[in-house]
């Protein structure tokens, strides 16, 4: 039976939150975690060029089956979360806004720390914006999320008068994902 390297990879990488590993590249965190666990690295399994899609072990065919301690390779990944808030007052006046947040990873490597199997992952990553950022935990999705809508009544300040009035507030959250995420199960050299 093959050795399970995942627990050692996860424990080591988790201990690096708030720190920079190696030269500070995203690759360094995964590579060092695998080496510390005694597993093979991308240098053992496949292309290692600056823009290569690294191979970190055995490919996991479905991300729902990825485990904590697996290595995640990104290619042209983008996650957009749009939160649309619409406020309707008794007189029919409507005010709304729709701010959005994006996570973009064109070519990136991370260590999976949680996978509840519902399209969400939590990863440990560094150099996530290309500025040698220290290791942190990030929640991402590997598939679009179902639209979530909540409706409440509450006091809201009107934009036109500046006065607070009771209003119906509808919040719609949409998450869309594009690009490729590939998980790899650590294995021996």
Language-model-detected regions and their locations in the chain:
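N-terminal capping segments
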Residues: 1-44, 82-91
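...with weaker cross-activation on analogous glycine-rich loops/strands in unrelated enzymes
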Residues: 42-133
């Amino acid at each position: 039976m093959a050795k399970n390297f995942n627990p050692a990879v996860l424990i080591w990488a988790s201990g690096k939150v708030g720190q920079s590993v190696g030269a500070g590249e995203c690759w360094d965190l995964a590579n060092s975690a695998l080496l510390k666990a005694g597993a093979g690295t991308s240098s053992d399994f496949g292309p290692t060029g600056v823009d290569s899609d690294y191979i970190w072990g055995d490919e996991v065919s479905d991300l729902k089956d990825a485990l904590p301690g697996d290595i995640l390779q990104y290619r042209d990944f983008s996650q957009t979360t749009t939160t649309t808030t619409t406020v309707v007052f008794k007189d029919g006046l409507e005010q709304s806004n729709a701010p959005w947040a994006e996570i973009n990873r064109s070519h990136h490597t991370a260590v999976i720390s949680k996978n509840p199997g519902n399209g969400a992952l939590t990863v440990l990553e560094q150099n996530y914006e290309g500025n040698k950022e220290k290791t942190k935990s990030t929640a991402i999705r590997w598939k679009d999320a179902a639209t979530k809508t909540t409706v409440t009544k509450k006091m809201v300040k009107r934009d036109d008068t500046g006065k607070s009035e009771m209003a119906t507030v509808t919040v719609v959250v949409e998450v869309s994902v594009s690009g490729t995420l590939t998980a790899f199960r650590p294995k021996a050299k």
